[in-house]
Amino acid sequence: MSDRLGPKVYSIAAHRGFADALVAGLVPRYGDAEFGLAKLTLLLPSARASRTISEAFIRHFGENERQGMLMPRMAVIGDLDLDESLGALLDPLGASDIPPAVDPTRRLFELAELLRTEMGDDAPPTSALLRLARETAATMDRLLVENVAPDELVGEPVLAQLDNLAKHWQKSIHIFARVQQRWLARLQERGEVDAATRRNMLFERTRRRWRENAPDTPIIAAGVTSAAPELAKLLRAIADLENGAVIIPDLDLAMDSAAWDELGKAGQSDEPGGPTFARGDVLTHPQYHLKLLLNRMGVNRDEVQQWHRKGISAAPPERTHAISSLFLPPRASKVWVDLNAEKRRLSGVRLMTSQNSEQEAQAIALLVREAIEEPEKRVAVVTPDRGLARRVVQHLQRWNIAADDSAGQPLHLTPAGRLLLQLARLTADDFAPVSLIAALAHPLVRRGEGRREWLEAVRSIDRAMRGPRPSGGLAAYERYASEAGVAEWWDDVCKKLAPLQVDGGPASLATWLDTLSAIAEDLAGDDLWAREDGRALSRFIEQFRLNAREVGTRIASDELHTVLRDAMEQIAVRPPYGGHPRVAIYGLLESRMTRADLVICGGLNEGTWPTTPSTDPLLAPAILRALGVPGSEFRIGLSAHDLAAALGAPEVVLSRSVRDMDGPAIPSRFLLRIEALLGDRVGEHREQQITALGPMLDREAGSTEDYPRPRPKPPGDLRDVPIKVTGLDRLLGDPYQFYAAEILNLRGLDDLDADPTPAWQGTLAHTILQRWHEARERDPAAQILPIAEAVFDEENVHPMLRGLWKPRLFAALEHFVELVDAQIDRKVVGVERKGSMKHKGVRVYGRADRIDRDAEGKLAIVDYKTGKPPSASQVEAGFALQLGLLGLIARDGDFESLSGDSTRFEYWSLAKKAGEFGFIETPLKVGSKRSGLEPEDMLPSTEEYLDQAIKNFIKGDEPFTAKLNPNYPGYDEYDQLMRLEEWQIQLAEETGGDA
């Protein structure tokens, strides 16, 4: 290598396998009988690349049955996107001539304060301000990496664009420029620099040192594709060293000159001071960033030599020709019309399409499972979709294949991170039931001894809390704890969580973190910090707490959860050790330089791979172009290069789903190009077997019989149950519902923090009316609204419900008072009275909302309704028999010693009618009514229905058929239990489509 004139730059073609081909060439060139490769220094892009090269050395020696050899020294440049630092070679200890880098968390908090000052009254809440500060820091880093000086923001190229921008862009660039100037002034005062600036300084110092005093030992830069100006200069210096070389992955040396020129100038303007990125540059091409790198290194593509070695698992050579043809720029792609078969050949590449993301994950897992049946075969799943990666990991667990996602898991999705965030949410939403139960039932809480007793208490109060959310914080749940029999346990919980109950005003973020970490540790103990996610959380808390205290960052309680979640999303928790030795799951950054026999590229849809280009929130695209900073479309080219590299594997599966979580998905532009390149032969590359096999995994063996309409026939001793006054119409209209409720004793469970149901609203209204009637017995002038207010307070009715329902309820209650006062011929003699009777050996029981007695001694049965009451026709058809049964109990039984003949039956509704809340309806045909039952027929008709029900179901042997009367307007709480959707089509056919 040292005999070459000019810069020593090499490229390894995609099909050769970069890591293995690199090692295959390094060993014979630099291997030493005595020292092995110890004198060689490899400069690599990331820590992941270092591990990949180490594994390649191990494979090389194992394949060639060679004895062990000393490994080369591996130095890491560090990938900013992976938040990696420079290795010791470039950033040695004691480098006092280079200022230290500012802590990134401190920078975040200080930038937020600077933005608040600059924006004044227009400043958003702190959570949004920190988000903007994070974006500001990212934009500053982009400029620093590209060597854009701060004063260039007011240079002629930028000023020339300002007048053409919208007002918000002009405002944002002014704010950004002022914040950057003030920030740099602060750094200068403290003797610090930004991390990106420090990297540039270290690159420049290393380059200068090696040029002035060239190292005696060889230095090879391998796999570096970043085109940052200072890094490009360092790579050129390495290429010029006598014992140096630069080895670039996947540079297309086969692309003809016309196509190469069509990519654009790539940093080489025709005139001094011209734009770095011209408008015609094809930034989305996978070779563009490599052309930019070569131009910044001052190296012509013709000077780059082919690395004439290949890896252990190299793909067919024609694969590189196909990849080159695949990504030809627009004008050059015209040659596809006459492209010969060799340059279209993609043998070993399969295309797989699934119906949705879940099926795609299952299909990918099946491919992995199939592949590892072959000894020594390595599989890599590459996808930028972390949700898809997590699903693949879960599907592989069915075969006990532990596959770690090397891209890591965001801290906020780990068990430790979730616990801290759930505690933060408690203070943000005033201890809402869902958040409270989620925090108390978290897997880390009381994980060891005592976990069972703890969960039993949590489940007890969980059941008691079902229904609409109360207001009042922790104190609102005391009566639920008492009802559930866990009052003592709840007192202990309240003491632990009490520090989170605050008035909502801003407080020190450091103090918040002290409180949250103390409570989390009190609940979970040392288990909170025991695993890698706990250690990452500990580092996060310490870093955030220290810098927040120094800067004085304050945050309101309702923003705490958002601020912590946004920050934790930026932290990836990677597994400390690998899973299956031949299975790996990578993100795009982690996949670079990796190698496998089978590479599965998942999530090949627009918006995922490539991602949707996002505009810089602070600097308009025209401003970035004027500054010579690549726009968001540059990343499309990088993702295209990642796909091109993946296509170099011996076997490749390109996978997508027709639908994603948001709806129908558009195939990736890269996938469409592949299909177009394959032309008529695309069908030969379709993967059909795996996609067909996937659905069979979860299908029961053999044929599955249709589920019949349920018709349970319990024995007589189980049938003999009492009948509620609200259950008779259910027994006749939908016997299965009666069977489930009264014989199986199954009840629907309300959700936590549920929307107010009519039943809940009815209970509240009944309580108010009961207390008002009782108060009127003591004081005829008692007012109903103060009583209603007191009931609302006792029940801790949530403020939102008070605002939405209370005005309508109170209007109806006031009208009820008027209606009661107008009935001067009646007297209320019973409120919420329980009653029962025996009828043909069956107990019939219920509660009367109100019973009045008229001047003739006859009774009026009143039933309160929060909504629309049953119609007279429904009562006549047997769909609403409650009033009639209450009348029968009053006649043949009693309501706590109250009995008599009932002649009036009324529904008092709180709903709106004729523009007014509160009205009375009767199912009887009285007055001017033209429909309804004759008064003398009300009780005989009801008794007839009761006799029929007792004869057929309670004392008889009729099956409790589901939906016996399809016209019965009952509830649907048992529809899932009866598996209605599985047989309702059959029901519709039987009833002529009336179901």
Model-identified regions with their sequence ranges:
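RecB-family 4Fe-4S metal-dependent nuclease core
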Residues: 514, 528, 662, 703-995
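Polyanion-engaging groove/track-forming segments
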Residues: 1-779, 789-795, 799-802, 969-974, ...
